[in-house]
Amino acid sequence: MTVEELKALIRTVPDFPAPGIQFRDITTLLAHGEGLAATMRHLGEAARLAGAEAIAGMEARGFIFGAGVAVELGLGFLPIRKPGKLPASTIGVDYDLEYGTDRLEIDPGAVEAGQKVVIVDDLIATGGTALAAAKLLRQAGAEVGQALFVIDLPELGGAQRLRDTGITVDSLMAFDGH
């Protein structure tokens, strides 16, 4: 399937979760077997070209796409979790949200020093979560130079924020608005 055909599988829900927001709902893409498989192939090819040695994804939808890309390439998957979800010792990073803060954690033993890790997630908006994930992976010893997203919302500036830290950003599709 082409990227335009994949884009047509994304449902837009107006005024969710608040008035004026155009929510880009990936569940319609996830439910479409051929579309989901094509998405993994497109993202997998980009990760392969980036020289990925492992794939990382953030809870929760990053697990779907990140694990799929890892399987596509025969690579390991590094889950980046919310606090208190990993049974082993963890390292973490706090990051700012619009109203407060949050935290991401990883098992540092899962990351090999110098390993080329590509971050994969469903959507990039402001980039806060992806920036925190990159910081965390680097803290664990990984080399992070690439992040892949199904959807970019360029008006929110997240992709540029990642680029400003030296991370190459690729997205399958972009949508105007929030």
Curated annotation (Swiss-Prot):
Keywords: Cytoplasm, Glycosyltransferase, Purine salvage, Transferase. It catalyses: AMP + diphosphate = 5-phospho-alpha-D-ribose 1-diphosphate + adenine. Its main location: cytoplasm. It comes from the Bacteria. The keyword Transferase applies. It is an enzyme of class 2 (transferase). It is found in: Cytoplasm. One of its GO terms (biological process) is purine ribonucleoside salvage. Pathway: Purine metabolism; AMP biosynthesis via salvage pathway; AMP from adenine: step 1/1. The keyword Cytoplasm applies. SUPFAM superfamilies: PRTase-like. Its EC number is 2.4.2.7. It holds the Pfam family Pribosyltran. GO terms for molecular function: adenine binding; adenine phosphoribosyltransferase activity; AMP binding. GO terms for cellular component: cytoplasm. PANTHER family: ADENINE PHOSPHORIBOSYLTRANSFERASE. Catalyzes a salvage reaction resulting in the formation of AMP, that is energically less costly than de novo synthesis. NCBIfam families: apt, PRK02304.1-3, PRK02304.1-5. Homodimer. This is Adenine phosphoribosyltransferase.
